[in-house]
Amino acid sequence: MYNPPPPSGSQGNNNYYRQPSSTPGVSNPNPQANQFLPPQPSNTTQTPGGYPPQQQQRPPTGAPQQPGGYPTPPPPGAPGGYPPQQQPAGQYGAPPQQQPAGQYGAPQPAGQYGAPQPAGQYGAPQPAGQYGAPPPPPGGAGISLVKNQQISLTKEDPTLRKLTIGLGWDVNTTPTAPFDLDAVVFMLNAQGRVRTSQDFIFYNNKVSRDNSVSHQGDNLTGQGEGDDEVVLVNLQAVSPDVTRLVFAVTIHLADERRQNFTMVPRAFIRVANQETGRNICRYDLSQEGGPNTALIAGEVYRDPSNPNNWSFVAVGKGMQGALPGLLQIFGCQ
């Protein structure tokens, strides 16, 4: 009886097909069919590839043989044999001989490779005024401040004892109306007023009574890069009842010449450590003056909780009235 093959492609079915042993009409398989019988010895010559293998062919005569028919290996030490012969020192694998000093890897004589170029050849700053903004002053530009931002000078530089206050600007000069800007300082008490008129520091009163503030002179043109006017401050010498130092810039004869701070580009104030030259902070005033004739640039003031600590605030407040207006505000007679 024909038994069909098991169905193909079925999945998940664990019942596989087998022929039942009692199928009618099908005789039982020979019980001896699967019994192992050892092979009988035979004198019949096996064909190539049969088992057991035929007797090995004898090797050609004339060459000495080892038992089993294998060729005799080369004598010990022959080229290509193992172990390899001892190589002469320095030829293969041996460490290289010590090179004479200076041939390989020794440092080059000073000045041949990588030595710094002579000063002024590469990377030197361009002459003042040729390209864009002026180069940053020595010691880096310091922290760039924005309007009303405050900074603790003492925390930024714990060694700070003396200040350099630099004020700079450019002017749009005309042949008939030259610009003359002046930097001034007001030494104020806790009430926000000068104690006497001598607390007003400017080009005609360059040194304060306590010698703590010193004006370095008037720049009548505003020409050149960097600081146009400089004020030096000895913080340790400032009188105890002075709590604020106000730094301002005014335009001389502004009303007569019809001038204001819209005609003064690239104005700034910077604060530096006078003893080390390190710039602590810088405030760009170019957009702060507007159509005004006086500009309060910034203030150096005592820390209310510790009078020995000093801070700076970027004010940037433009005002009308030029210098006479500031004198009235701060109580100068």
UniProtKB/Swiss-Prot annotation:
Would you tell me the protein name for this molecule? cAMP-binding protein 1
One Pfam family of this protein, by short name?
A: TerD
Q: Does this UniProt record's set of keywords contain Nucleotide-binding?
A: yes
| Region annotated 2 X 12 AA repeats of motif B, chain positions | 84-107
**Region described as 5 X 9 AA repeats of motif C:** 87-134
Q: What InterPro entries has UniProt attached to this entry?
A: Stress/Tellurium_Resist, TerD
Q: Where is this region: 3 X 5 AA repeats of motif A?
A: 48-83
